[in-house]
């Protein structure tokens, strides 16, 4: 078998790749061995006797499979962990994510009119003060606050109505007393006459 080291080197130079990427047709070795210049190699490339091999793919199938399993909680036990809990998921990042979720919810509720700007501001500061552990806690708090506000409003209206009725009754009684007094005075005047 002929030594094709020179031809391989020239082919790598012509094809602008490494020597391991150069393929030479094993059936045409005699013709390839006669090529001793770049020009001849270019002709062989054109004829298809010398070819540049395609790049090898680096499959991500296995890593995708592992990621899918990790999302389900596999391969994440104590034995698989290298860093501290803080290094793996910094508490600052957890805090920022939670605040962004809560503030986005508050903004959405304010824009849709579910809460007014005063309640928004109060809840914003409470969220900043770590009152709410998660989104559901905030939603439940808002529902309770609205229910409490409605209850307070209803009680206030009932008290106002009761006061109005009591005032009307007082006025009626006072009017009746006044009329009775007038009758007594008129009767007394008639008797005196």
Curated annotation (Swiss-Prot):
<dbReference type="GO" id="GO:0022625">
    <property type="term" value="C:cytosolic large ribosomal subunit"/>
</dbReference>
<keyword id="KW-0687">Ribonucleoprotein</keyword>
<feature type="region of interest" description="Disordered">
    <location>
        <begin position="157"/>
        <end position="179"/>
    </location>
</feature>
<comment type="function">
    <text>Component of the ribosome, a large ribonucleoprotein complex responsible for the synthesis of proteins in the cell. The small ribosomal subunit (SSU) binds messenger RNAs (mRNAs) and translates the encoded message by selecting cognate aminoacyl-transfer RNA (tRNA) molecules. The large subunit (LSU) contains the ribosomal catalytic site termed the peptidyl transferase center (PTC), which catalyzes the formation of peptide bonds, thereby polymerizing the amino acids delivered by tRNAs into a polypeptide chain.</text>
</comment>
<dbReference type="InterPro" id="IPR033935">
    <property type="entry name" value="Ribosomal_eL19_euk"/>
</dbReference>
<dbReference type="InterPro" id="IPR015972">
    <property type="entry name" value="Ribosomal_eL19_dom1"/>
</dbReference>
<comment type="similarity">
    <text>Belongs to the eukaryotic ribosomal protein eL19 family.</text>
</comment>
<dbReference type="GO" id="GO:0030684">
    <property type="term" value="C:preribosome"/>
</dbReference>
<dbReference type="InterPro" id="IPR035970">
    <property type="entry name" value="60S_ribosomal_eL19_sf"/>
</dbReference>
<keyword id="KW-0689">Ribosomal protein</keyword>
<comment type="subunit">
    <text>Component of the large ribosomal subunit (LSU). Mature yeast ribosomes consist of a small (40S) and a large (60S) subunit. The 40S small subunit contains 1 molecule of ribosomal RNA (18S rRNA) and at least 33 different proteins. The large 60S subunit contains 3 rRNA molecules (25S, 5.8S and 5S rRNA) and at least 46 different proteins. eL19 lies in close proximity to the binding site for eukaryotic initiation factor eIF4G.</text>
</comment>
<dbReference type="InterPro" id="IPR039547">
    <property type="entry name" value="Ribosomal_eL19"/>
</dbReference>
<dbReference type="Pfam" id="PF01280">
    <property type="entry name" value="Ribosomal_L19e"/>
</dbReference>
<dbReference type="GO" id="GO:0003723">
    <property type="term" value="F:RNA binding"/>
</dbReference>
<keyword id="KW-0963">Cytoplasm</keyword>
<dbReference type="InterPro" id="IPR000196">
    <property type="entry name" value="Ribosomal_eL19_dom"/>
</dbReference>
<dbReference type="Pfam" id="PF25476">
    <property type="entry name" value="Ribosomal_L19e_C"/>
</dbReference>
<dbReference type="GO" id="GO:0003735">
    <property type="term" value="F:structural constituent of ribosome"/>
</dbReference>
<feature type="compositionally biased region" description="Basic residues">
    <location>
        <begin position="164"/>
        <end position="174"/>
    </location>
</feature>
<protein>
    <recommendedName>
        <fullName>Large ribosomal subunit protein eL19B</fullName>
    </recommendedName>
</protein>
<dbReference type="GO" id="GO:0005829">
    <property type="term" value="C:cytosol"/>
</dbReference>
<dbReference type="GO" id="GO:0002181">
    <property type="term" value="P:cytoplasmic translation"/>
</dbReference>
């Amino acid at each position: 078998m002929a030594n094709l080291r020179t031809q391989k080197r020239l082919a790598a130079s012509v094809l602008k790749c490494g020597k391991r990427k150069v393929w030479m047709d094993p059936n045409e070795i005699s013709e390839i061995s006669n090529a001793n210049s770049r020009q001849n190699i270019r002709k062989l490339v054109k004829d298809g006797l010398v070819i540049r091999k395609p790049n090898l793919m680096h499959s991500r199938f296995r890593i995708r499979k592992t990621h899918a399993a990790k999302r389900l909680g596999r391969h994440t036990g104590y034995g698989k962990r290298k860093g501290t809990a803080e290094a793996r998921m910094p508490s600052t990042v957890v805090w920022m994510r939670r605040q962004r979720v809560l503030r986005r919810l508050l903004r959405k509720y304010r824009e849709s009119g579910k809460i007014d700007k005063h309640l928004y501001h109060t809840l914003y500061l409470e969220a900043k003060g770590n009152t709410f552990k998660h989104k559901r806690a905030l939603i439940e708090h808002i529902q309770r606050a609205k229910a409490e506000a409605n209850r307070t409003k209803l009680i206030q209206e009932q008290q106002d109505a009761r006061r109005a009725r009591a005032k009307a009754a007082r006025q009626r009684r006072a009017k009746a007393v006044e009329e009775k007094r007038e009758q007594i005075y008129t009767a007394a005047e008639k008797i005196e006459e």
